[in-house]
Amino acid sequence: MDRERYDKVIEACSLSKDLEILSFGDQTVIGERGINLSGGQKQRIHIARALYQDADIYLFDDPFSAVDAHTGSHLFKEALRGLLCSKSVIYVTHQVEFLPSADLTLVMKDGRISQAGKYNDILISGTDFRELIGAHQESLAVVGSADASSVSENSALDEENGVVRDDIGFDGKQESQDLKNDKLDSGEPQRQFVQEEERAKGSVALDVYWKYITLAYGGALVPFILLGQILFQLLQIGSNYWMAWATPISEDVQAPVKLSTLMVVYVALAFGSSLCILVRATLLVTAGYKTATELFHKMHHCIFRSPMSFKIAKTCSKTCIYSS
């Protein structure tokens, strides 16, 4: 692993504090759905994985949609304009405040490229694009004024209740610090939800085969299956021996039995072997179907009665693989 690039990517994607919060840092298993992560954290992790690949061409499809404005500005500055300054980046976005930094701007309308060129050139030549930029700036101004008014109201309340807020803040910090110290002093290792599977190596034990054999009807069909197989083999050997003994070697040698007797006995042996193989196959299919049904029902019963920790630790993909 390139540790230097790894640290740069973590810093550019604002993941340092997130890794500190996680119990096992960057070794925390988050599962197939990104458990314990918010939408913004997932998005920044995806961006970090792409940045670490150190490719020549990057394609971003509105990557800052799940993050706030401040984080989006940081990602654009540190990631796209920082780490990827020497790369070819195709950036698709609705956030027009990032367009002045682009080398080439393509304006899409109804699925087609309506304008192409530098940001300032398009802004001067295109009325639609100018209206879009103006509407975006007006919306930013409205949001900024609303934020400023809320901040002023909060500051006024802080001045009126400053002592009370300071006391509450001090107590809250002290309590959180005490809880943190208690967790550190307890010394109990935290457990990950998704754990690595344990696999047994070696040959399959005999009791496993015995449980499988006796699962269908308590193993009552097994003797009949073996008997059918044994009778089939005996009849096959008998029919071959009968044909070798009853068939004359040449025309000069007299046959030990009549031709009709030879055919009747051979047909009887063939019919008996066919009947045995039919019975064996029927019993084998019945036992196999019953065993598979019992295993499936037991598996469903265990899954439905399992605690929530099992459903978190075992992902849906693994459960489906085991079920198949």
UniProtKB/Swiss-Prot annotation:
Annotated ABC transmembrane type-1 domain residues: 222-324
Record-annotated membrane-spanning stretches: 212-232, 259-279
Source organism of this protein record: Arabidopsis thaliana
Keyword Glycosyltransferase annotated: no
Name this polypeptide is given: Probable non-intrinsic ABC protein 5
Compartments where located: Membrane
Protein family membership: Belongs to the ABC transporter superfamily.
Keyword entries, A-Z: ATP-binding, Membrane, Nucleotide-binding, Transmembrane, Transmembrane helix, Transport
Topology of the protein relative to the lipid bilayer: Multi-pass membrane protein
GO terms, molecular function: ABC-type transporter activity; ATP binding; ATP hydrolysis activity; ATPase-coupled transmembrane transporter activity
InterPro entries: ABC1_TM_dom, ABC1_TM_sf, ABC_transporter-like_ATP-bd, ABC_transporter_C-like, P-loop_NTPase
Keyword Transport carried by entry: yes
Domain ABC transporter: 2-111
UniProt GO cellular component terms: membrane
Family annotation (Pfam families): ABC_tran (PF00005)
